[in-house]
Amino acid sequence: MKLQLNQNFARIKPSYLFSDVAKRVRAYAEAHPDKKILRLGIGDVTLPLTPTVIRAMHGATDEMANAATFRGYAPEYGYDFLREAVARHYASFGVSLDPGDVFISDGAKSDLGNFVDLFADVPVLVPDPVYPVYVDSNLMAGRTIEYVEGNGENGFLPLPTGLSDLPRLIYICSPNNPTGAVYSAAGLAEWVDFALRTGSLILYDSAYEAFIADGSPRSIYAVPGAEMCAVEFCSLSKTAGFTGTRCGWTVVPAALGSVKPMWERRQATKFNGVPYVVQRAAEAALSDEGMKECMEHIAYYKENASLIAGLLSKKGIAFTGGTSSPYLWLKCPGGMGSWEFFDKLLSEAQVVGTPGEGFGRAGEGYFRLTAFGSREATREAVERLDKLL
């Protein structure tokens, strides 16, 4: 082939963080087939879809089997019934949305990477440590990335203090992946004020909003003025166990002017919509009964987090998260590096976590554990770590 490839791909790591983790775990498992490995690494759920969701999927599947109720291509922006259900969900925690501003997606990850299609070569600001998709999708597009560091001193919740007034795309995730830290209303207000003053746009990832239990905002739109400077991305992956079912949404307020019609045009060209069966399942998950069941699952994962947090506290290991988040972000003991600690846990306890270095330079020396395992696996992992650490 004589065509020139996108040279920006040379700016990203050859493989994705979780692929690297999986490769090391696979190699260890092949070399030690007698060892039982407990996985507290990648944030995939383990509980099944809830009864309300399954009933809706069965009903929608039956509709697809009947010529009178069969549906083909879904609307690019989502069926009205689900857009309205999302708006009702936001209303349940005091945020008013126009259903017409809601765009149904196959999960937050895709739209977080694709939304930057709307922008020219503009500067991008990301927190560090950071979910790798924010960085890689912009490096692929050739953009310049600026980092604002999260650390123990600021509780891994960096603020715009000291930043220049350059307009930027600004990524914020709360509750944060990987650190589990949650912005207060005052903290988010500082970012909204900064974005309004500088003409920036916040790309707000609220994928873990259902885990919030301390009264912190569950949406950027709980902050006055955010509709003028923010797009919000959310997902049912962790709220309703949809990691393998795939459904979420992106909120693009009409107040953002040309951004919304541009996103409509982009989606009409590059997206064929989320399947009808999945959207009916999502509608059911967001119903009163569906959310009750979802919150029972979230309580299960939070109990797992409590078990892990109890161990870390017992060992005197500093950490964030685990209360309003499924993630626990801990300081590697003994001054160990992230991958060094990963190898120690895998080889000596057969417990898998995620090295903080994979989330950015500021993540070196830290480690992420997740609460998405089964109760039995979490208890066993805690027992093993109790003996090791």
Residues of each region from the PLM?
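Conserved glycine-rich beta-strand-loop-beta hairpin in the small C-terminal domain of fold type I
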Residues: E283, I298-A309, F319-C332, G363
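N-terminal small-domain helix-loop-helix segment of the aminotransferase-like
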Residues: K2-D106, N114, A285-D288, L389
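Conserved core segment of the aminotransferase class I/II
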Residues: G225-A299, S306, G310, L389
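PLP-dependent enzyme catalytic core of the Aspartate aminotransferase-like
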Residues: R88, S96, G335, K344-G353, ...
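Helix C-cap/helix->beta junction micro-motif
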Residues: H32, A141, R197-T198, K315, ...
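Hydrophobic residues in well-ordered beta-strands that form the structural core
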Residues: V126, Y147, Y204, G353-P355
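Conserved core of the PLP fold type I
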Residues: A68-F194, E209-V223, E227, V231
